């Protein structure tokens, strides 16, 4: 039965002139629009949120690890995860296409489509870094961050032309990997790679600023902790007198 269903699905794809090239394009579009933003923001924010949930954030105050370094390390591993997720997506796409019997699989198609998927995972990660840092530092907000990432990714459909079609961060993530959005988002103007670089660059710069601001946050917490200890010692001395 499963074999017949697989063949039937393959026949449907063939009737719609579906081939491996089209399949790879659909995966790149779907990943950047929904799957990667939701997954990366949810998992990245969750990793940072563990420090607050497990009450281990206070340990940073006593060991020589700054808040920016801690957050930067977690962002780095989320980036590694994004690349691995892209490679995994390439494998699943290949297996799916072979299972349903799609045509058009060549070395060139596989290399081009697979490279676009992995690079799109990386550029989408760069765009999502500020969201990961913001919602990761708000206790229990990682689910809300993933929902916002979904809406931001889906909003690509509303920018059909002009500057916003190229500078909008999630659209820019696709433009930088050479993806043609005209057949998916209905864009009416040619993409501008320079604006795309600016769009992604703004998000990276925002993430850097958030990392720098996190050091001030740690200093404020340290001062509050020192002040509370000082007040406690003074109270003990008064009682002793």
Q: Could you say what each language-model-derived stretch is?
A:
Residues 11-24, 146-231:
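Terminal transmembrane helical anchor/hairpin motif
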Residues 37-52, 57, 128-143, 202-218:
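Transmembrane alpha-helical segments in integral membrane proteins
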